[in-house]
Swiss-Prot record:
Belongs to the LTBP family. It comes from Homo sapiens. Contains hydroxylated asparagine residues. GO terms for biological process: establishment of protein localization to extracellular region; sequestering of TGFbeta in extracellular matrix. The modification Phosphoserine is found at S1414, S1597, S1616. This is Latent-transforming growth factor beta-binding protein 1. Changing N1366 to A/Q: Abolishes N-glycosylation at this site without affecting ability to interact with the Latency-associated peptide chain (LAP) regulatory chain of TGFB1. Residues 187-219, 399-431, 626-663, 873-910, 915-956, 957-997, 998-1037, 1038-1078, 1079-1119, 1120-1160, 1161-1201, 1202-1243, 1244-1281, 1286-1328, 1424-1466, 1467-1503, 1621-1657, 1662-1706 form the EGF-like domain. Residues 64-81, 112-130 have a biased composition (Low complexity). Residues 99-111 have a biased composition (Pro residues). Its main location: secreted.
Amino acid sequence: MAGAWLRWGLLLWAGLLASSAHGRLRRITYVVHPGPGLAAGALPLSGPPRSRTFNVALNARYSRSSAAAGAPSRASPGVPSERTRRTSKPGGAALQGLRPPPPPPPEPARPAVPGGQLHPNPGGHPAAAPFTKQGRQVVRSKVPQETQSGGGSRLQVHQKQQLQGVNVCGGRCCHGWSKAPGSQRCTKPSCVPPCQNGGMCLRPQLCVCKPGTKGKACETIAAQDTSSPVFGGQSPGAASSWGPPEQAAKHTSSKKADTLPRVSPVAQMTLTLKPKPSVGLPQQIHSQVTPLSSQSVVIHHGQTQEYVLKPKYFPAQKGISGEQSTEGSFPLRYVQDQVAAPFQLSNHTGRIKVVFTPSICKVTCTKGSCQNSCEKGNTTTLISENGHAADTLTATNFRVVICHLPCMNGGQCSSRDKCQCPPNFTGKLCQIPVHGASVPKLYQHSQQPGKALGTHVIHSTHTLPLTVTSQQGVKVKFPPNIVNIHVKHPPEASVQIHQVSRIDGPTGQKTKEAQPGQSQVSYQGLPVQKTQTIHSTYSHQQVIPHVYPVAAKTQLGRCFQETIGSQCGKALPGLSKQEDCCGTVGTSWGFNKCQKCPKKPSYHGYNQMMECLPGYKRVNNTFCQDINECQLQGVCPNGECLNTMGSYRCTCKIGFGPDPTFSSCVPDPPVISEEKGPCYRLVSSGRQCMHPLSVHLTKQLCCCSVGKAWGPHCEKCPLPGTAAFKEICPGGMGYTVSGVHRRRPIHHHVGKGPVFVKPKNTQPVAKSTHPPPLPAKEEPVEALTFSREHGPGVAEPEVATAPPEKEIPSLDQEKTKLEPGQPQLSPGISTIHLHPQFPVVIEKTSPPVPVEVAPEASTSSASQVIAPTQVTEINECTVNPDICGAGHCINLPVRYTCICYEGYRFSEQQRKCVDIDECTQVQHLCSQGRCENTEGSFLCICPAGFMASEEGTNCIDVDECLRPDVCGEGHCVNTVGAFRCEYCDSGYRMTQRGRCEDIDECLNPSTCPDEQCVNSPGSYQCVPCTEGFRGWNGQCLDVDECLEPNVCANGDCSNLEGSYMCSCHKGYTRTPDHKHCRDIDECQQGNLCVNGQCKNTEGSFRCTCGQGYQLSAAKDQCEDIDECQHRHLCAHGQCRNTEGSFQCVCDQGYRASGLGDHCEDINECLEDKSVCQRGDCINTAGSYDCTCPDGFQLDDNKTCQDINECEHPGLCGPQGECLNTEGSFHCVCQQGFSISADGRTCEDIDECVNNTVCDSHGFCDNTAGSFRCLCYQGFQAPQDGQGCVDVNECELLSGVCGEAFCENVEGSFLCVCADENQEYSPMTGQCRSRTSTDLDVDVDQPKEEKKECYYNLNDASLCDNVLAPNVTKQECCCTSGVGWGDNCEIFPCPVLGTAEFTEMCPKGKGFVPAGESSSEAGGENYKDADECLLFGQEICKNGFCLNTRPGYECYCKQGTYYDPVKLQCFDMDECQDPSSCIDGQCVNTEGSYNCFCTHPMVLDASEKRCIRPAESNEQIEETDVYQDLCWEHLSDEYVCSRPLVGKQTTYTECCCLYGEAWGMQCALCPLKDSDDYAQLCNIPVTGRRQPYGRDALVDFSEQYTPEADPYFIQDRFLNSFEELQAEECGILNGCENGRCVRVQEGYTCDCFDGYHLDTAKMTCVDVNECDELNNRMSLCKNAKCINTDGSYKCLCLPGYVPSDKPNYCTPLNTALNLEKDSDLE
């Protein structure tokens, strides 16, 4: 904030530089030209300059340090120095530069003049020459006012010389631009009305305002407090001005200053407080001015003459947040006899206390989702060491520097009085630019602060006001006293500044005590709009650049106000820049596609980050400027927009009010239908409404809560965030509009912030506009309210914040607990409660109303202690909380008192808070308007031409000139309550209606005598006539070309406007320019002379026809000749004419001749060999006849077809198949059968008659159609089933002999060791020496191997039956294992009771060796094997294992049993026991079963028998289906709940469609993933039906099932027939292995795949695929087919192993070779 007005005050500040003389008094008069030019010699920017002359009288005490700091160069004594430099330009002169005077030579001491002078020159046109008088130089300069067009004369309307460059339209400067002086380029913008108050015209109709001013033309000075300042004995309405004491009376009585334009002069001065002034002060001022802090003051002379800090620009340094508002002002009051210490601009500022809290925030990312976590540290208080040293406070890992200097242009304050400047700036405040400078080494080093401190740190800057603690502990702000807090801290930490206050004065005395003999004046901050005690969190300190995604800043795009997901909506109608859109109302921006706006746009500064607050945009690296949102089209629909600082205001039209987002005006009130309808909680992808609520609701109640669709037509609810959603849910999700809430029909104001003008009928609420970027842990904040007397009976509240654990010890406090996110109290802001439906924050600044404090609430009363003997009164505040009405009740020892809200006062008669009539009690309220009192507030009713001020306390004039085109092309002059239009620009004239109208210069014929005159707004242009016209008196007349000879030969000429056209004769066509006729080549058209030849002629053509054609009557076509008119053509047929010829269509049996002119008979017997096959053909006239032999018959096509004798039933018998042959048949008998003697049947062959069929290794067993060989042990039947072959155990059992060589023998095998001195041990599978015993073990023998232990080797999936993966062979075989090995290479364990078992397990089953090996010396150390520990859950699955000695026990749950082979607890099927459910339907469940009885039978007491109740006499039909309640939910304790309402179902319907239990007995339904559920609900297991065939072969493995297609089970009510369960089906046993369906004829069974229907028994029986299909096709290749229930499986033959093909086994040798080949590859 300080940096902005210091830029404007540099020229004044330069004049205050000290010289080496001591005690000199110098008076210097400067002519100050307000403008943005800073450096000496800079040219002033465009705009209407208004000069002011200030006289500054300084009493400076020079010192050596100050003289050496920055004294300018000295001049020779007596030689006057040049102060100004004038340059001539059209229209007047302008001040180009201002140079500070050199210091004069030393002179004798002169009497000092007290104070300083600063006042504007009332003359307005000063003109004086420099003069020197007694060491006092006065420079006066006259700066005439420039014209609005830049000082030049008015531009000529018609310029002969064409301008070049940009902004040129039609040979002249575009509208809004003019020529720059001394050039022919249109580069000077024009602002109409001109920029006022020293503003700069940046581009047409865009003014860059000076600090402290605002508006479209900078015509409005920053808003000030309407309350009058108190100057000693002055009345509240008296005016005063800033100046030295002796000039105060003059300024008060002078009226010339009021006639001057409202320009805010900017000056920087140091007011020195003298102990004993030599000149007496006027009586109006009894106190002296206390010196300000090191920050300079921007003084705005407003109408109330109040001194306010009102920045338009503010320093955009990193870390600035909190409640400081650019809209806020700091009014100052002169208060007498206040106890405060004087503060001066020096290093003697006393001790300063800084209270801050460090926080450490980290980002944790898990699986692509990141979240912030912040941990707050302890609150730390630091106090500076002394007033002379730099204010550098140091804590652990933190370095805090307090700086009073406003370092500019990215400079950093390293100590109290030193700025470390960037490389391109210099000076004490880094205010002087340096051109072409290189980066010094010191600055290069400063860019890496981490290296200087030894660790990486972050530099943060916080600009905060300096407060002083008074006697009562109230924090008093000194608005001019603003300090910069520089904090260097680790990068992962952030700093929260709580308090920056002064402890004692410059001499060490405490601020609570006043020094005797001093009359002091203190500055006290009044409660102003949007200002409160600083309590902000500064986080996100890392310098991370945030840039816009579009590189070109001038690129225009569309601004979107809503962004939902990846969709952008609510676009403004016009185009805007990204920085204007994203800095104000936009959430996304783009042209072809939208891009989300960054959360906080940032730009790099020097060693810090510059961030602009919302509503502002960057001007340069150190300053941010307000964005005029009203320049964005459509920002205030249905309303008028007014720009404010950092925001804007919308005045809604009558009948409109603000929407919940405060971004537009919507019809007021919204029409919400009260119609009720069904509310649906879910909408499926097919747009079907589901899950309706039980009651009907309105659309608002439905869509604003849980509904997704509403109404009888399933209307989808609008998405949250859309305009349709806001219309029916203005309060957002979860809130509805009640009937009592209706907006008042007044003008509403909509904006980005709380800027509405409404009554103040509730407590003040503070609004935070800058939340911390990183989420922090929210903690409760205690709001402590204090009171400090400002005068008799006047108290002013202040709000301070402190941590919950640190309370301020005061007895007259009222402490209120505020949770995070709740509105906090702040003085000077009047709001209404935040209703969920209308979250509108209304603000207005009203005149200060005294807050009455009851005398009972003082400290003395509050500290009274009630004695134990006293009787306390009833607490009225507790009994009746609303006893005070609009106020807060405070109980007292006697009765109670009320602290009333703003706008109310306490009435002693009514004992409650009553409304204050501000209209009668407050003077000068609602000036220029009418005041209307309201409950708790008031309203200002403004007449036409006026509007309510931002504070809502006065009616201010509406500047109609700010509206575009209000005067057309003229100049608008605003008046009080109205406006008028003055002179017009060149090319325009004033109408009687007061508007500027364009002059049509083209009405004068002499304007363009030989050219065409084109009128344009404000100008005209002479344009040469185009071809076909000639110029005459400013018009272009047509030339008649048809009068010229040889025009349009072979055609007629028609004159046109500016041209002519030819109408050509027949046979000719116009050329493309329509000015000539040329011949048409008709032969190129393609549709002439068809079937002939076309020849083009001049203007026509000629046709020559071919054979069979003749010329048409029009002679343009060749017509066909109809030859069929001759009757003798085409005998035995019909004549058909064709193009150019004819065709004979002959009758059947005839064909056309070679020439096609007659019909001939066809001899079918010679030409068609396919006729009369297997017979004799006889040709006839036009046809033929066939004669067939025996065994054939003639068909309709006259072909001899074979007679199929196999169609006769019983032919070839059941063991044969009839095969039809040509003219006969043949019986094909099945294998094992032969044809009978007559050849019509098949007889069985007895293969066992031949004794050599099964040789000597088995015996023969004859079967029907075949035989089988029953082989002895060690032999097996081959694939063809004939004979018995030896089983090669060495190939079948891999590794059966271990390390020995396996030798196959007839019927058995031998294990032979390679060494003759060794013998094979079947126990260990190893070859051992014959001299050693099994117990002798070599010392070097390795430890016994550990492999996998297997169980249940008879299972097809035996490789998966692993008990334990790492056990010895004895641990496996001596316990529960049956096989031992690795990777399914299994060594079978010896059988219990054999010698091999005794050798391996000498102690018996259940005992294993105690050592690491089974061959310890002695072999006697054995222990009991803990099978439960050794095998874990595998030995007792689904049960509890208990080890015993020897062995173990497996305890299963009730209803289950233990399978010792599969080592698992399985469900016990109680339904196998007929006594479990007699005369009922038994349904097995996991661990239990259910017994269901058919209606009307019920269960008896034992629940195992269905009996008929004695009282029932109903006749029961077999087809009745029993229905009962269906329970939708079953708890973990098996308690049924939530019965299906309105419907009774069968057991199947309940379990398959609706619930989890059924019936009054709460019969449990099977689990959804169980086989019982699939069987109950008829869910196919295999998925789809498949036909038999080679492609339908399933895998040999039992676990293999073909991949099932996805299937969808429809709801029961959509099925064409109902699927019924056993108790509902009319068929016995309920179609087991199939589904029972109800058809019109009754019931039938739909069998599953693998079963077929036996119609005799009406049951589904298994299909034996191995018998019925294996004869037709080989189901198993090199494998044996084994039938299973509903399917079959293939088991590989010995010597074969499974392959990757289904049902195919490959030889073992081939498989091994393939594995070797794959290993080699």
